[in-house]
A protein has these predicted regions:
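Core alpha/beta structural scaffold of self-assembling particle/tube/pore-forming proteins
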Residues: 1-303
Length: 303
């Protein structure tokens, strides 16, 4: 699961306060609430938490008066079925994002026309963002999340009200995630690869810019400089792909087997050790993981 979960650091949506432990239902509920605001389909959404946060949340249910919830929470730290989630799990293989040396609010965007057209980014869903005014040689890490002043999140489903084609915006700022490690030059300038792209109109609008253009917007990051932030994530099953393919069967080897079940293909090959007179079995799989739709998930911290 480590390879699959490592993709969760590329979710740009983040709720809660960076570094805070999840210890209350309200702290956890911010995640399914955000998924609903992002129009993520219900039914196949799951939450995965670090043991520290999972046990913290389990403690929130020990005082309930429903025996089927309180007893497992006390005896096995088992999480009940949670509204908005098909299931909630704990894993010690979630990624840990170590923030860059950038400070919380330091840099500015540098360029008046830094928006994207859907047709140009539809296969990558990313863009470059030219920035300046950072500290010299400041670093930015893949998984760093930030907002731009005056750039708000939008309801991805609703269209305009008849007087405008713009989607209605929420009261909170749109978040963006850094996709690649970068370092500012000696003058504090850097070009960041980010997702989602800034699409400010049309059916695939990702944000609403209340500013005249995209120049000089304050960049505010989630988490302090060099902060260590374990990732909790809630997401739809279609957000991340796990792909395998059947391996070729070796020629001249008997008793080989290959089986594909629910899209996962495994090959078994007998290996005879003639020196030690031992029969061994080799199991092989080839696979890859990939974030395929960052719109279908969110990271979360405690309140």
């Amino acid at each position: 699961d480590r390879d699959i979960l490592d993709n969760t650091k590329y979710f740009w949506s983040t709720v809660g306060t960076a570094g805070n432990r999840v210890t209350t239902w309200a702290g956890f509920a911010a995640a399914p609430q955000r998924l609903m605001e992002m129009a993520v389909p219900e039914g196949d959404t799951h939450a995965v938490m670090t043991p520290n946060d999972g046990y913290g949340l389990a403690g929130a249910f020990t005082g309930t008066y429903v025996q089927d919830i309180a007893r497992p929470a006390i005896e096995r730290a088992k999480l009940p079925s949670l509204p908005g989630m098909a299931a909630a799990y704990m894993s010690n293989n979630l990624p840990v994002v170590t923030a860059g040396t950038r400070v919380l609010a330091d840099g500015l965007t540098n360029g008046a026309s830094q928006t994207s057209n859907w047709a140009d980014v539809r296969t990558t869903f990313k863009q470059d963002l030219i920035c300046d005014d950072f500290a010299a040689s400041a670093t930015f890490k893949a998984g760093d999340v930030f907002t731009l002043s005056g750039v708000y999140a939008v309801n991805p489903v609703l269209s305009g009200d008849g007087t405008t084609t713009l989607k209605p915006n929420y009261s909170y700022l749109q978040q963006f995630v850094v996709l690649e490690d970068k370092q500012a030059d000696g003058a504090g300038a850097v070009t960041l690869s980010i997702s989602p792209p800034l699409i400010t109109s049309g059916p695939y609008q990702t944000c609403y810019n209340s500013n005249a253009n995209t120049d000089g917007l304050t960049i505010t990051f989630v988490g302090a400089a060099s902060a260590i932030m374990p990732v909790n994530a809630a997401f739809h099953r279609n957000a991340i792909a796990f792909v395998t393919r059947p391996l070729e069967m070796p020629a001249g080897v008997t008793d080989c087997a290959r089986e594909t079940y629910k899209g996962i293909s495994l090959r078994m090959t007998p290996v005879w050790d003639g020196i030690s007179s031992v029969q061994n079995w080799r199991f092989d799989i080839i696979y890859g993981t990939q974030m395929i739709d960052g719109r279908l998930g969110t990271r979360f911290f405690g309140a």
